[in-house]
Each structure stands twice: as structure tokens, then as C-alpha cells.
Amino acid sequence: MSEALGMNGKDAPVLACRDLHKRFKEGPLDVNVLSGIDLAVAPGEQMAIVGRSGSGKSTLLHLLGGLDRPTRGEVWLAGEALSSLSERRRGWLRNRNLGFVYQFHHLLPEFTALENVAMPGLIGGLAPAQAREQAEMILEQVGLADRTRHKPGELSGGERQRVAIARALVTRPRCILADEPTGNLDSHTAERIFELLSELHQAQGTSLIMVTHDAALARRMDRTLELMDGRFVDER
């Protein structure tokens, strides 16, 4: 099936889904959140997903990231169908190929910036010294070489988000999934964070899928898809 859909080969999508559905139970009711989503993300592509609150944007991102399972349909990451994989294999594939950035940074408060950023490498099996070296390099790239020993509570909002971006990119993933990464920041800091994401995307050739309410930001992406009532209704 993956071969028929063009999931393999050097030009294959980094991330793709076919006929994706997600339904939740709310008491006696079945609530359809996503209905028949098809998507293919090319290597190095920047994509925005927009839509009103409750349209299914974050749910879609969770499914694409293998953090939740669809009610129906399939997600392919790096050519592998996620539904056929064990939890261990899914976790390994996520760690190797995906980075996650959220509106709220989700940094571990008891660890320093360096320790937070080194975590994905350690989980992926790197020796502590190598994970630390990679973390130091990416923190320098995001302009935080002098803040590596600070804990999240000692950093500004913009600095915390830069640490989160460094953590997402430290393993050089093939795709970044960003859920409102600038939504909790003032306009000046939000612009700096978007520019940083774009610069690192260009430097590493990483694909970027960003959920956002910011129409101006979305217009700067390669492609924008609009979700309404669980379906894509517009592409531009």
C-alpha cells in the first residue's frame, strides 16, 4: 500500500495520511472531530493549518505525530504505517523523525535548558557526552549559549520557547509539528520565534507543519490548509 501511495523513495512524503477520521465519545454522543483527511507533506515543505477553535487542528497534529490513534484511516511517517507498529517502534520512529513545539513550552521545570534539550538524544540512545554536545550546539544556534544552565523559571517567555525549539530540532528530525508556537507571546517575540523556526528549517531542510490562528504568519508558509468541521475546505 505504501508503495502505491508513493510513500517510499527520496521524494516520498515525510509525513502523510489517508482517509483520517477521529471520533470521541461525549456521554451518549459520538462527536466526529476529523472526517476523511488526506495529506502529504513534502521534504522541506512549510505548511500552515488554520481554522476556528474546535475545528480539529490540534487533534490532527496529535494523530500525525503518532500521539493518538485515528478511529479510521492511516498515517505514514518516514514511509511506515503507524497502525502496524508496536508502541516501542512508534516511539522510536517519533524520536528519530519528529520534533514537537507547543504554545506552552512543556519544559521540565527541574532541569536546566541544556538538560531539557539533551533529553531527546538520551532517549534516542546517545551517550550523555554526545547528547550534551548536541544540545550545546543547538542552544548556541538559537542564541542561548549563555543560558544553558538556567532552569525554565529563570528564563523569559521567548527564551523558554527558544529552548523548546532547540529541543525539537536537536535530533535533526525530518519534520517539526508546531501547535500555536507563537500564540502565548507578544508580537515582537512571536516574530522572532517564527524567524528562528524559518532559519532552522532552511538550515536543516526540515519540514514544518504549523497550526496557527495568525493569518499573516500563515501567508508566509509554502501552503496553507483550512480546517472546518473536521474537513479541509480550502488550500492556498
Swiss-Prot record:
Topology in membrane: Peripheral membrane protein
Q: Which stretches make up the ABC transporter domain? A: 15-236
What GO terms fall under cellular component here?
A: plasma membrane
**GO molecular-function terms, A-Z:** ATP binding; ATP hydrolysis activity; transmembrane transporter activity
Q: What is its EC number?
A: 7.6.2.-
User: Which Pfam families does the protein's record reference?
Assistant: ABC_tran (PF00005)
The residues listed in the UniProt record as binding ATP, with positions renumbered to this chain, are G51, R52, S53, G54, S55, G56, K57, S58
List keywords of the entry alphabetically: ATP-binding, Cell inner membrane, Cell membrane, Membrane, Nucleotide-binding, Translocase, Transport
Cell compartment(s), UniProt: Cell inner membrane
Keyword presence, Lipid metabolism:
no
Q: Which InterPro entries match?
A: AAA+_ATPase, ABC_transporter-like_ATP-bd, ABC_transporter-like_CS, ABC_transpr_LolD-like, LolD_lipo_ATP-bd, MacB-like_ATP-bd, P-loop_NTPase
Any one of the GO BP annotations: protein localization to outer membrane
Job description of the protein: Part of the ABC transporter complex LolCDE involved in the translocation of mature outer membrane-directed lipoproteins, from the inner membrane to the periplasmic chaperone, LolA. Responsible for the formation of the LolA-lipoprotein complex in an ATP-dependent manner.
* The name this protein goes by in its record: Lipoprotein-releasing system ATP-binding protein LolD
Give the source species.
Answer: Alkalilimnicola ehrlichii (strain ATCC BAA-1101 / DSM 17681 / MLHE-1)
